[in-house]
């Protein structure tokens, strides 16, 4: 069941939550709406569900105009961040709730509940109450309850946001495996870049009520459409074009109408650190080293006082043996310039000064 969004906009007073959104979610795909708070991702999900009505535009589900269709008639499964399970009902009763409301035959209901308990890997726990389950197990039950009525579309609003990091990671892998089994058209909201990249077939990056880019995790990471996307999907150094680091590199600087050169964007993984100089490297001093298991973060201050962050894998770290105060030589393997870009701050940007 595909979902098509045509020119959808939504205002809340003076605040524009969505502005001329156009999007197609292909049949059977798992799509992530990714963005910071206030980007419009949850409003778009709620509009698809029927919890918010657009001020303009059209929402088409399975070829039918659902823009003004009541939420109860859309046949959509919805999973919230905080489970919303009935505390006084057992797990079986929670899963069966939607089927019983729809007057489903008892024998069929029982069969469907057992099927879903197996699907969410909670066989044998059907007679327990929500309070007797872990957070991860409760979220699986919430998902099973949403799937019980065999919805056309599954919507998930930050489903793992209330769980700790280890459980979130386990459930991400489980959700991806589950989707590969049921092939239900699904849309989930998240502000977690890693979650979106690990789980989704396609990612919709949103900012300020607009779509910045749509693509696979690889497409968005390797070919970001804007400085916002590059900064939001992973960390990035934003450096002045006249930094000594780029004196040896031949790519042409872009200049804006006012004559200012756009900054250069380099991901921490795209720096190479050397113990000896070559023709394309510049000298710097290591200011700080942070060991993160399989990865090492190295902050380097260049001779012109430009500060950069580089990432090393374990093998590179063993070869370089980075320590604070050590002199190194650094060069970018890959650098990107966006026409019209400025050095406007963003949470995930690492600037070339003041680290």
Curated annotation (Swiss-Prot):
<dbReference type="InterPro" id="IPR017871">
    <property type="entry name" value="ABC_transporter-like_CS"/>
</dbReference>
<dbReference type="InterPro" id="IPR027417">
    <property type="entry name" value="P-loop_NTPase"/>
</dbReference>
<keyword id="KW-1278">Translocase</keyword>
<comment type="function">
    <text>Part of the ABC transporter complex CysAWTP involved in sulfate/thiosulfate import. Responsible for energy coupling to the transport system.</text>
</comment>
<dbReference type="GO" id="GO:0016887">
    <property type="term" value="F:ATP hydrolysis activity"/>
</dbReference>
<keyword id="KW-0764">Sulfate transport</keyword>
<dbReference type="InterPro" id="IPR005666">
    <property type="entry name" value="Sulph_transpt1"/>
</dbReference>
<dbReference type="InterPro" id="IPR003439">
    <property type="entry name" value="ABC_transporter-like_ATP-bd"/>
</dbReference>
<keyword id="KW-0813">Transport</keyword>
<keyword id="KW-0997">Cell inner membrane</keyword>
<dbReference type="InterPro" id="IPR008995">
    <property type="entry name" value="Mo/tungstate-bd_C_term_dom"/>
</dbReference>
<dbReference type="Pfam" id="PF00005">
    <property type="entry name" value="ABC_tran"/>
</dbReference>
<feature type="binding site">
    <location>
        <begin position="35"/>
        <end position="42"/>
    </location>
    <ligand>
        <name>ATP</name>
    </ligand>
</feature>
<keyword id="KW-0472">Membrane</keyword>
<protein>
    <recommendedName>
        <fullName>Sulfate/thiosulfate import ATP-binding protein CysA</fullName>
        <ecNumber>7.3.2.3</ecNumber>
    </recommendedName>
</protein>
<dbReference type="InterPro" id="IPR050093">
    <property type="entry name" value="ABC_SmlMolc_Importer"/>
</dbReference>
<dbReference type="InterPro" id="IPR003593">
    <property type="entry name" value="AAA+_ATPase"/>
</dbReference>
<comment type="similarity">
    <text>Belongs to the ABC transporter superfamily. Sulfate/tungstate importer (TC 3.A.1.6) family.</text>
</comment>
<dbReference type="Pfam" id="PF08402">
    <property type="entry name" value="TOBE_2"/>
</dbReference>
<feature type="domain" description="ABC transporter">
    <location>
        <begin position="3"/>
        <end position="233"/>
    </location>
</feature>
<keyword id="KW-0547">Nucleotide-binding</keyword>
<dbReference type="GO" id="GO:0102025">
    <property type="term" value="F:ABC-type thiosulfate transporter activity"/>
</dbReference>
<dbReference type="GO" id="GO:1902358">
    <property type="term" value="P:sulfate transmembrane transport"/>
</dbReference>
<dbReference type="InterPro" id="IPR013611">
    <property type="entry name" value="Transp-assoc_OB_typ2"/>
</dbReference>
<dbReference type="GO" id="GO:0015419">
    <property type="term" value="F:ABC-type sulfate transporter activity"/>
</dbReference>
<keyword id="KW-1003">Cell membrane</keyword>
<dbReference type="GO" id="GO:0005524">
    <property type="term" value="F:ATP binding"/>
</dbReference>
<dbReference type="GO" id="GO:0043190">
    <property type="term" value="C:ATP-binding cassette (ABC) transporter complex"/>
</dbReference>
<keyword id="KW-0067">ATP-binding</keyword>
<comment type="subunit">
    <text>The complex is composed of two ATP-binding proteins (CysA), two transmembrane proteins (CysT and CysW) and a solute-binding protein (CysP).</text>
</comment>
């Amino acid at each position: 069941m595909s979902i098509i969004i045509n020119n959808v906009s939504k205002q809340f007073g003076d605040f524009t939550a969505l502005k001329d959104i156009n999007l197609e979610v292909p049949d059977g795909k798992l799509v992530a709406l990714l963005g910071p708070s206030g980007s419009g991702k949850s409003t778009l999900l709620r509009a698809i569900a029927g919890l918010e009505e657009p001020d303009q535009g059209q929402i088409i589900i399975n070829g039918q105009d659902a823009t003004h269709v009541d939420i109860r008639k859309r046949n959509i499964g919805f999973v919230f961040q905080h489970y919303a399970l009935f505390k006084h009902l057992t797990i079986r009763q929670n899963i069966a709730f939607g089927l019983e409301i729809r007057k489903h035959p008892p024998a069929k209901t029982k069969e469907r509940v057992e099927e879903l308990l197996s699907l969410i890997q909670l066989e044998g726990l059907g007679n327990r109450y929500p309070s007797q389950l872990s957070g991860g197990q409760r979220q699986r039950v919430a998902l099973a309850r949403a799937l019980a009525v065999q919805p056309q579309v599954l919507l998930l609003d930050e489903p793992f946001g209330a769980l700790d990091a280890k459980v979130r990671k386990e459930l991400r892998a489980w959700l991806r495996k589950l989707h590969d089994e049921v092939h239900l058209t699904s849309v989930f909201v998240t502000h977690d870049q890693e979650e979106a990249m690990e789980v989704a077939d396609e990612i919709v990056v949103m900012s300020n009520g607009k779509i910045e880019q749509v693509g696979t995790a690889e497409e968005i990471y390797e070919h970001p459409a804007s400085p916002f996307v590059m900064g939001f999907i992973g960390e990035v150094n934003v450096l002045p074009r006249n930094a000594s680091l780029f004196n040896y590199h031949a790519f042409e600087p872009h200049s804006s109408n006012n004559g200012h050169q756009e900054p250069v964007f380099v991901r921490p993984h795209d720096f190479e650190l050397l113990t000896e100089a070559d023709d394309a490297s510049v000298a710097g001093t290591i200011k700080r080293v942070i060991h993160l298991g399989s990865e090492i973060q190295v902050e380097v201050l260049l001779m012109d006082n430009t500060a950069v962050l580089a990432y090393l894998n374990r093998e590179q770290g063993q070869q370089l043996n980075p320590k604070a105060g050590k002199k190194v030589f650094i060069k970018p393997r890959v650098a990107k310039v966006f026409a019209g870009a400025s050095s406007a701050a963003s949470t995930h940007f690492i600037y070339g000064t003041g680290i």
